Amino acid sequence: MSEVRLKSEFWLKAQLRLCDQNCLPAVIARRGDADAGQVLVKVIQSMQACEVLAQRYDDDAQRVWTVVSHGVERDCDAYIAREADVDPDLWVLEIEDPKGQYRPDGEEPRR
């Protein structure tokens, strides 16, 4: 049986609302396929610290949020640009989170 998933656009709009409720500035920086585009979340912690999160499958075939790039913002932007070159349906959500409050789907991302 296939996994039930929310449409990408719906999930992103929910994340924007959650960020707004928690006073975290957030913006959809890149729009992809409304139904099934992959989502990258760029979390900007400071001028020198940034992470990119993506959903991946773990060893138990469960989807988990994973840090796929980290470092200064330009390194994270380069990772996103490479992903966008191969995936035109890619979405990018950017969040300013200096206190490290953001948790996608309420879970701590894996490193």
Regions found by a protein language model. Give the residues of each.
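Polybasic/polar functional segments that serve as interface/processing modules
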Residues: 1-111
